[in-house]
Amino acid sequence: MSNKKLHFETLQLHVGQEQADPATDSRAVPIYQTTSYVFRNSQHAADRFGLRDAGNIYGRLTNSTQGVFEDRVAALEGGVAGLAVASGAAAITYALQNVARNGDHIIAADNLYGGTYNLVEHTLSTQGVETTIVNPSDFDAVDKAFKPNTKAIIIETFGNPNASVTDVDRISEIAHKHNTIVIVDNTFGTPFLFRPIEHGADVVVHSATKFIGGHGSSLGGVIVDAGKFDWKANADKYPSIAKPDPSYHGAVFAEVAGPAAFVTRIRAVILRDTGAAISPFNAWILLQGLETLSLRVERHAFNTKKVVEFLANHPKVAKVNHPSLPDHPDHALYEKLFPNGGGSIFTFEVKGGEKEAWAFIDSLKIFSLLANVADVKSLVIHPATTTHSQLSPEELEQQHIYPSTIRLSIGTEHYEDIIDDLANALENI
């Protein structure tokens, strides 16, 4: 390939395998279904384990199929390196555990996915990590939430489930004033529509199960390192990355791995010790999805626009929570950050309550009632009694989830068929 900067649609097909597979001459990325790798000699083995020679060591840490997937997602996000793990939840957990330990503090947006909210509010607290929950649109509150021991702020490009939009530029500006990293979950944004690193993010995480895979078939997560944070200048704040690691013979990851220090430390230490490794087969399946990401996301966005317009004008719909609507509080920010649309996972409220919401859901024919999102098939769920059922009534209200709230994930079927299904179900309430 030439040195000319390639377009997204080309990168999603070629990065990581610019030439045919060196072992087999295969054009498609092979599935390297192995646990282990043969070293040429003892010195070669020692160099691999000592991080002096990059390459495969053991299947829990690296795999050649996985490596192509990691390189491709990192390139699409504009990062320097990526790490694929077993799920999106593992990616988020590892990103936070990489910098926050017992006695530390993190900040989390109040519009995070319910599973992430439980992680930061409950699970990490048992590990001695304190979390402050903030409204990411209240910049004064965000600024005041920082403490000397704050190690990260985690936000989402689109909130789950209400598709609220986060001003990544402003949050990054505030966090960097406090010499703190910004972790952005870009699962719903996708790198095709929005690249958080270009807006100040230091780390990007994905549930690759969603848009990247796109077909609801395989679990996976990805962590992308922007490679821009100065770890050595903040060594006292981030000793796990910028000071000697006693579990790795005193290696300083900021020196050994340079710009890729963040993900290298996760791979070499946290993944090594806790083992949420992605399987080669899942990495391969997710690669198949990644190759058509732009095509699918364009259709998702187009269909979503049509569906939102339909619901916003239906007499049995009380409210549609989508930033494309002029009366949405994030509308101006949405127009600025997402000129090509997006937000195909969103909520709306039927007139009535849980009874009416359930009646609507149970009357749908094309939509599938399940917990996943961002599938090519249209999906539906009742958040208050399923995905967010662990939250207290006060927490549900804080996230604007009510008995009448329904979450939709708009697929790539023909938009008229999607709308007909919604219209018929609304007639049954």
Mark where each language-model region is.
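PLP-dependent enzyme catalytic core of the Aspartate aminotransferase-like
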Residues: 9, 80, 121, 148, ...
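Active-site beta-loop-alpha junctions enriched in small/polar residues
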Residues: 158, 187-189, 325, 351, ...
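Conserved PLP-enzyme active-site core in the AAT-like
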Residues: 2-3, 16-20, 83-314
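Conserved N-terminal alpha-helix of the aminotransferase class I/II PLP-enzyme fold
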Residues: 41-93, 115-122
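N-terminal "arm"/small-domain region of PLP-dependent enzymes with the aminotransferase-like
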Residues: 2-63, 71-72
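Conserved small-domain helix->loop->beta segment predominantly found in fold-type I
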Residues: 274-283, 288, 292, 297-299, ...
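Short hydrophobic/aromatic beta-strand micro-patches
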Residues: 224, 347-349, 409-411
